[in-house]
Swiss-Prot record:
It comes from the Bacteria. It catalyses: 6-hydroxymethyl-7,8-dihydropterin + ATP = (7,8-dihydropterin-6-yl)methyl diphosphate + AMP + H(+); (7,8-dihydropterin-6-yl)methyl diphosphate + 4-aminobenzoate = 7,8-dihydropteroate + diphosphate. Pathway: Cofactor biosynthesis; tetrahydrofolate biosynthesis; 2-amino-4-hydroxy-6-hydroxymethyl-7,8-dihydropteridine diphosphate from 7,8-dihydroneopterin triphosphate: step 4/4; Cofactor biosynthesis; tetrahydrofolate biosynthesis; 7,8-dihydrofolate from 2-amino-4-hydroxy-6-hydroxymethyl-7,8-dihydropteridine diphosphate and 4-aminobenzoate: step 1/2. Mg(2+) binds at residue 187. It comes from Chlamydia trachomatis serovar D (strain ATCC VR-885 / DSM 19411 / UW-3/Cx). In the C-terminal section; belongs to the DHPS family. In the N-terminal section; belongs to the HPPK family. This is Folate synthesis bifunctional protein.
Length: 450
């Protein structure tokens, strides 16, 4: 029987949606049969460039380290890694150039294992030159020893190596939790409960989207029609498009040729808005607050988009139209989710990744029901077998914790975000990106989620 061997890999990305590329690479490694995978935090670092490299290659990297166990030999593992990289459109001829994903084998087997072929060298010959790697390795296996005959570091633990070659403030540009991505909210409306009227002007909305991306959002959700309980008139398609179109055109100018950019999501329940949007900007997500109509599912299939299905008992939500009090809200949402996913699978969507489930915190749920639904993330992921997003940011259910206006609930939002990350949520939709991103990274670094 083939034995299982320890493996330590580094993952890096400095093109496109870097956080999403790290996530996809991690999922691909699991599919390749690497078991018991654990990830470090993601650190953003400056690019390491050869002298004379083009200036346009100077793009910051997202880096993480993963450990696990594999039955593949070193050469077989390298071949698997090359296949994964090729699926990202990797140009192998650009050595040291920008890339959507770069996966290196750092260590393999027991501590004394060394290997050299035309495909790889183990231990990785550059590992001691990269303090950010040593820091991440030490967070996962601090007492494993570095073994390399002739090296002054031979026999030292990674905990000690991380102290000898410390990660400095200049080395780390930022940090991110590896498991959960953040969707930043841009409300292009005059009647939202939060940020109302702040981003009606297209240039302000586009600038806010850029700021949220800079703060750590890997997805930007643009909404030009409010659907909160205070809304009486949902307005027309033309009114919604009049607000959304100029923002999309500005972002197309700014991100169209950008080498690093987020995914863009459109928050709408109107298929016509999606049809118009794809003509203006290469959007990646549909955020359907109506729960995912079949027409929206067909659009997701046609254009290769991800479909976020947000449950709501009514549109706009009404206080007299909520989930049943006689049954667990989690069970009610599971039935609804299973029914929706079955329909979307028949349309041809891959529900394991293309459909994202959102139980709709505050949309036809009491504060207690919303609290219970946030506690149900693990059940949703286990039963539905699809990604889960929670949109709890500044919601009225948080008023149970104190009398704060909607724009002053970010502390409560962040506290819930940390708890949701611990439950394995895939995406968090929030207004205040930087605070959530920093809190999740700190919690991950402290060992809560690695």
């Amino acid at each position: 029987m083939t034995s299982w061997n320890f493996v330590c890999l580094s993952l890096g990305s400095n093109l496109g949606n870097r956080h999403e590329h790290i996530r996809r690479a991690y999922a691909s490694l699991k599919k390749a049969g690497i078991r018991n995978l654990k990830s470090s935090v993601i650190l953003e670092t400056k690019a390491l460039l050869l002298e004379g490299a083009p200036k346009e290659w100077d793009l910051p990297y997202f880096n993480s380290v993963v450990i696990g166990e594999t039955q593949l030999s070193p050469d077989e593992l390298i071949e698997e890694i090359k296949m994964i990289e090729s699926r990202f459109g990797q140009d192998a001829s650009l050595k040291w150039g920008p890339r959507p994903i770069d996966i290196d084998v750092l260590f393999y087997g027991d501590e004394a294992f060394s290997y050299h072929s035309d495909k790889c060298t183990i231990p990785h010959p550059k590992v001691l030159e990269r303090p950010f790697l040593l820091s991440m390795i030490a967070s996962l296996c601090p007492y494993r020893r570095f073994r390399l005959e002739g090296s002054s570091c031979n026999g030292k633990t990674f905990a000690e190596l991380a102290a000898i070659y410390p990660l400095t403030e200049e080395d780390a540009l930022g940090s991110f939790g590896s498991a959960t991505q953040i969707m930043g909210i841009v409300n292009i409306t005059d009647n939202s409960i939060s940020d109302t009227g702040l981003f009606l002007e297209a240039r302000r909305a586009a600038a806010h989207a850029e700021r949220l991306f800079a703060e750590g959002a890997s997805i930007i959700d643009l909404g030009a029609q409010a659907t909160n309980p205070r809304v009486k008139d949902l307005g027309s398609v033309e009114q919604e498009w009049e607000r959304l179109e100029p923002v999309l055109r500005l972002l197309a100018e700014r991100w169209g040729a950008a080498q690093q950019c987020p995914d863009v999501s459109i928050d709408t329940f109107r298929p016509e808005i999606i049809r118009r949007a794809v003509e203006v900007f290469p959007i990646r997500w549909i955020n359907d607050v109506s729960g995912g109509s079949l027409e929206m599912a067909h659009l997701a299939k046609e254009f290769g988009l991800r479909l976020l299905i947000n449950h709501s008992c009514s549109l706009p939500p009404r206080p007299d139209c909520v989930l049943s009090y006689e049954e667990s809200p989690i069970e009610q949402m599971l039935r609804w989710g299973e029914s929706q996913l079955e329909q979307f699978a028949q349309v041809g969507l891959d529900t394991s990744w293309q459909v994202v489930f959102d139980p709709g915190i505050g949309f036809g749920k009491t504060p207690v029901q919303s609290m219970l639904l946030m506690d149900g993330v693990k059940q949703f992921k286990r039963v539905l077998e699809c990604p889960v997003l929670i949109g709890h940011s500044r919601k009225s259910c948080l008023s149970m914790l104190g009398r704060f206006n909607s724009n002053d609930r970010d502390w409560e939002t962040i506290g819930c975000s940390v708890s949701l990350h611990d439950r394995g949520v895939d995406y968090l939709r929030v207004h205040q990106v930087e605070g959530n991103r920093r809190a999740l990274a700190a919690a991950a670094w402290a060992g809560m989620f690695v």
